[in-house]
Amino acid sequence: MGTGDLNLLKSWNPKLVKNRKKVWEKEQRLLEEDEKIRKRQLEIAKEKEEEELLAGRDSTKGRKTGLEWMYQDDPTAKEDYLLGKKKLDTTVIKKAEVMEENQTPLTKINKTTVIPDAIYSKEDPMARFGTKVKRNKVVKKEPVKPLRGKTTNEPRTDNIKPKSDYKKRLQEELDY
């Protein structure tokens, strides 16, 4: 009555063609990845060999890559000076003096000089905002208007009554 293997009806059955195809595709992808890894390892090995050959050749010729300036001085010497372990050499001091002598008048200008607001505001938007705030403060500080012909900048000293006394003041004015 039963007609055979019930496992053929299951989706996970390894004998089914669709499952065999999935397994084969995964194996192919893994093989391709392994091949790419091998190629990259060969490229890296070749690059290392070339660098070793160039390093041996460059030590005799002195080939420059453009980054030598970062490594020219001994960094520990600078640190020793900064930490107070070592004093400045006279050659360093002489170099600084020669540099000062070679400077033009324009380069001798103190770099801590005050930058005019006009130049500074062109570069910095917050400085522009600050100058506008300063201008507004200056505008608000207008002198007090003098009382009937007096020419003083002193604040008014006459008795100004609060608004709550408005009706009383109005009545006083009408009584005149």
Curated annotation (Swiss-Prot):
Keyword DNA-binding tagged: no
Example of a GO biological process term: mRNA splicing, via spliceosome
Protein name, as recorded: Pre-mRNA-splicing factor CWC25
What does the sequence similarity comment in the record state about its family? Belongs to the CWC25 family.
Coiled-coil positions are 25-58
Tell me which positions the record assigns to the signal sequence: none
Identify the main location: nucleus
What the entry lists under SMART domains is as follows: Cir_N
Does Nucleus appear among the keywords? yes
Q: Where is this region: Disordered?
A: 139-176
The UniProt function text for this chain reads:
Involved in pre-mRNA splicing.
Checking Pfam families in the record gives: Cir_N
Q: Name one GO cellular component term.
A: Prp19 complex
How does the record describe its quaternary structure? Answer: Associated with the spliceosome.
What subcellular compartments does it reside in?
Answer: Nucleus
Keywords linked to the UniProt accession = Coiled coil, mRNA processing, mRNA splicing, Nucleus, Spliceosome
